[in-house]
Amino acid sequence: MAKADIHPKWYPDAKVYCNGQVVMTIGSTKPELHVDVWSGNHPFYTGTQKIIDTEGRVERFLRKYGMSSTQTSGDEQTKK
C-alpha cells in the first residue's frame, strides 16, 4: 500500500525571479524561486562570453615544472 500525503505540494505555475523581475514560470515544489543567473543573462547563452587568460596555460605548465621553451632536449645536447 502506498502512503498518503508524503509528497510535497506541487506548484505548476511557480514564478522564477531574477533581479526582482519575473523571468519565467515553471513547475516546482516552491511557489517562488529567486535566482541570480538564468539563461537570459548568463554570458555563455547571450554570446557575450569572454575568455580571460592572463597567462597562457602551456607557459604556466612549462614554468611550473622547470621546462622552458629555450632549453634543448637531451638528444640535441649529446649530438654536439
Swiss-Prot record:
GO MF assignments: rRNA binding; structural constituent of ribosome
InterPro entries: Ribosomal_bL28/bL31-like_sf, Ribosomal_bL31, Ribosomal_bL31_A, Ribosomal_bL31_sf
GO BP, one annotated term: translation
Claim: Cell membrane is one of the keywords in the record: no
NCBIfam families to which the protein is assigned, alphabetical: L31, PRK00019.1, PRK00528.1
Record text on subunit structure and interactions: Part of the 50S ribosomal subunit.
Protein name per UniProt: Large ribosomal subunit protein bL31
Species name: Nostoc punctiforme (strain ATCC 29133 / PCC 73102)
Gene that produces this protein: rpmE
